[in-house]
Amino acid sequence: MEPDWIACPECGLQQSCPSCKKPVEKTWVACPVCAQKLDQPPMIGKEKNAAAILTLERIKDYQDRIRLSSRPFYERFADSLPIKNWLFWILVGQLIMLGHYLLARTRGVNIFDDASWFLGIMIGLTMAFIDKSTKNLRKPFPIMFDIVDEPADEFGKWFMNHLSDGLKDRNMLGYGLLFGSINAALGHIYGVWYEDPVLILSITVQWFLIGFAAGLGFKGGIIIIKLTGNFGKKPLIFNSESIDGCGGSSYLGRKILFDAFLYFVVGLMVAGYVLSSPWENAQAPLIKNLIYSWIAFPYVCTLALFFMPINKIHQKLAKFKAKEQNILRARRKSLYLDLAVDSERCRLMEDAERETALKNLTDVVTELRQVSQMSTWPYNSRNLTQFFATLFIPIGIWFLENPSRFLSFIG
């Protein structure tokens, strides 16, 4: 409840008289000052609507402020153009590929023989994914607010500060430059197959750009882990009757799964490119292990993003579930004892009272079954099935279609 609210926007419970605005208690049937009737929870019309609208307006206000304060340089630039962001980044990737193709063609080199044609596509798709993932960072705010036990202003400022600090241009550029430099250096360590200096420069720039994009994505993953981990330390309110089977937290889990999926797609592209490129030093044992490590890195990031951010939320969901189960089991036991044929309580019960007790027992057993089925992770079984199918099916298909290439590379 906010200090200026007359009533709760969720259940309508009053804390102030809708007529004279004097504080009231939930057990009062009427205001002692103006005699206004107070049926709790009341149907208070305008006052209830005003409280709900106030909350929605604050959420919308913070969403606008969060969007304006957490737009890194690449998103601001793409947003300023008259086309969709994802389309812009894909066009950039196509132009990079076209430039490399024209340079290679003038020198009699076919880029479709060495997989370098795929670099431009990778750059465009990765930047489109990162742009989308950055926008997704802001979307969980209303859902987080819905399950956190904090006032709107306090939580809004906390969320905005965490996101804007993490997405500062300096931080994003630092990670981009670091990963870009490492990726370009690794390409030369693996062994450049070109002899023409212009083509060497062209492919080095592309290695740097794809590494730069990967650095932006890596920093985004760190932001997700920190933001969600710190959120999990806050007082949270779960609902055992939520239809998602996760106490009302599955939306947050789906957003994390989506970002983990993007990491995985980037990992597939990296693996496909690395395994298809004719590296000069690929058969050297040390270089081969280095290549394996670089291929595995996006998949490690995918799994880290899948498990690490929601660990605190998982712990709180587990405690909530255990507490609810203990309460319901105690109620079930009490009702069983009351309804036992040889109990004094049962002998003294009227028929109507016994029917009520039986109905209560049925309700408690049903609720206990529902709570027992609740997941202690913000992922339901459908989310998990989709995620792991997405992970393993493409790898299996690629291996079945290219067994000789894979075996020759690892051999």
Stretch-by-stretch model annotation:
Residues E47-K234:
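Transmembrane-helix bundle segments that line or gate the permeation/cavity pathway
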Residues M1-K46:
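Cys/His-rich metal-coordination motifs, chiefly Zn-binding "fingers/knuckles"
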Residues M1, S16-P18, K46-L54, L102, ...:
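N-terminal soluble segments of membrane proteins
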